[in-house]
Regions:
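Non-catalytic, membrane-anchoring transmembrane segments at the edges
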Residues: 1-506
Length: 506
């Protein structure tokens, strides 16, 4: 049976609990992926099966999950990836990054436009554009890595570009295994190509062969690992599984359950669409509505908290996401962590928010856009973000307003913040003030992202009197008259926990 839309297998469950079918499918697919992940690490680890088997099984499971969730609509993901791989094979590496980017974004924009024109958003709040967005990340990561590896000298590359540069084109299986691996194909978070290849080949953790390291590998590791001595001789490395992910997986699953409870029992009490409802607006003043916007936008973020936290747990359960050890020797499982909710909710600046929100996508924006654009980096990155998210007018309201707000915030930080560094109490007051303003600004700009449409966005901003846009503009005009403060005052702050690089980039 070919499905035009999502799988109908769980339609009865959807009708009985009143949750859209697509959301039921996605959660079910993530639960299946979690089960597959534990089995993948246990039975398909690098020391038991070949790289070929690991790649083929990961891609096959991912394709099955896609078909379960999206039915015949998943053909768009296959076509999208196939077109980009064809370009990768046929096009010269000197232009492969630009060509792949244009193909991937053009196809994605067509699907986004179709969603705007034809989709029933109430019945299908999710569609195949989600996996296509993830595929766009992955195919462009490979293409830009190839261009950097073939056409840029290593000494001219920044560290991030050098780390992800590629010196050969991936094989068909390597490419499509990366695109479709089951841990992240439905809802993310995605990984970079080199990180995935290290994982699938068993090279994401290794120890140098020397007496000291031999002592560090206990007898159980040697027995369970069954390490190939010839590989050990040739590579001078011992490859083994990362430390057990059970603890981080359990913690992330518990956190996921917490966010599910918030999403089910609290978030529905604060619908985002109420922000542009004429009756609600007529019944409440600006201050009340601004407070409601902050609460409702926080509730809107919860669905991302739960799906990305669960996605991180799925990756970790399979062994993907191990990121070395802390100085005290504890394993880190944050290589592809995509959301840090508690750090995010304590943000005192837009930069702190961005550093903890949709982390892997932000890294992608920096990798292919922000670090490569010679001017107006923030503006072009936010425009790309709007295009990548879709064609709804609300996205463009949000990201263009966000770019403007960030420029205003940077000027305030550069010229006003030094006056508050003269005492601890002033610094705390400044942090509290920026905490409030940051969360108001995020809610104010985020309403358009969630109401989606032009008229609804205009209703909200008109009845808010565009106050934050005006405040940002006035601040920028006024602060241009003030001289910049000596940079040494920022240096004092770096000694209390912020690096100089972060201060300069914020």
């Amino acid at each position: 049976m070919a499905w035009r839309g999502p799988s109908r297998l769980l339609e009865g469950v959807s009708d009985s609990i009143g949750v859209p079918l697509m959301q039921i499918n996605v959660i079910s697919a993530e639960i299946l992926a979690l089960i597959f992940a534990f089995a993948y690490r246990r039975y398909l680890c690098p020391m038991k099966v070949s790289v070929f088997t690991r790649q083929l099984s990961a891609a096959s499971l991912g394709m099955c999950l896609l078909y379960f969730v999206y039915g015949s609509e998943c053909i768009h993901v296959f076509i999208h990836a196939g077109l980009c791989y064809t370009a990768l094979l046929l096009a010269p590496t000197s232009i492969i990054h630009i060509l792949t980017f244009l193909i991937a974004m053009s196809y994605l924009m067509c699907i986004h436009l179709r969603r705007v024109l034809t989709a029933d958003l109430e019945k299908y709040p999710l569609d195949v554009s989600g996996p296509l967005m993830l595929t766009t990340l992955k195919v462009t990561i490979v293409a830009f890595g190839l261009h950097d590896g073939f056409h840029r000298k290593p000494e001219t590359l920044i560290e991030n570009h050098k780390r992800h540069s590629l010196r050969r084109k991936p094989s068909t299986l390597e490419y499509f295994s990366y695109i479709f691996y089951f841990q992240s194909v439905v809802a993310g978070p995605p990984s970079f190509y080199c990180d995935y290849q290290d994982f699938v080949k068993g090279e994401n953790i290794h120890l140098p062969v020397n007496p000291q390291s031999d002592m560090e590998i206990n007898s159980n590791d040697r027995k369970d690992g069954d390490i190939n001595t010839e590989l050990e001789k040739n590579s001078k490395k011992i490859h083994r599984l990362p430390p057990s992910p059970i603890k981080p997986v359990c913690l992330k699953l518990c956190e996921t359950l917490f966010w599910i409870c918030v999403h089910v029992f609290i978030a529905p009490r604060f619908p985002a669409l109420l922000n542009s409802d004429p009756v609600f607006i007529a019944s409440h003043g600006v201050v009340y509505r601004m407070g409601y916007a902050v609460i409702s936008m926080t509730c809107c973020k919860v669905k991302y908290y739960l799906i990305w936290t669960m996605g991180d747990a799925i990756n970790n359960a399979s062994g993907l996401g191990f990121n070395g050890f802390t100085p005290s020797g504890k394993p880190k499982w944050d290589l592809i962590t995509n959301i840090k909710p508690f750090e995010l909710e304590r943000s005192t600046s837009a930069k702190m928010f961005i550093d903890n929100w949709n982390v892997q996508t932000v890294l992608w924006f920096r990798y292919i856009c922000y670090t490569r654009i010679p001017f107006q980096r923030t503006l072009f990155t936010f425009i790309l973000s709007a295009l990548w998210h879709g064609c709804f007018p609300g996205y463009y309201f949000t990201f263009l307003s966000g770019a403007f707000m960030i420029q205003a915030a940077r000027m305030v930080r550069r010229k006003v913040r030094p006056f508050f560094l003269k005492s601890t109490s002033l610094k705390k007051f400044y942090d509290f003030l920026t905490f409030l303003l940051t969360h108001m600004a995020l809610a104010y700009t985020g309403v358009a992202f969630n109401v989606l449409y032009f008229n609804e966005s205009m209703i909200f901003y008109n009845n808010m009197y565009w106050w934050l846009h005006i405040a940002g503009l006035v601040a920028m005009l006024f602060l241009t008259l003030l001289p910049a403060q000596p940079r040494q005052q920022d240096d004092k702050v770096t000694k209390n926990g912020h690096t100089l690089e972060k201060v300069k980039s914020s």
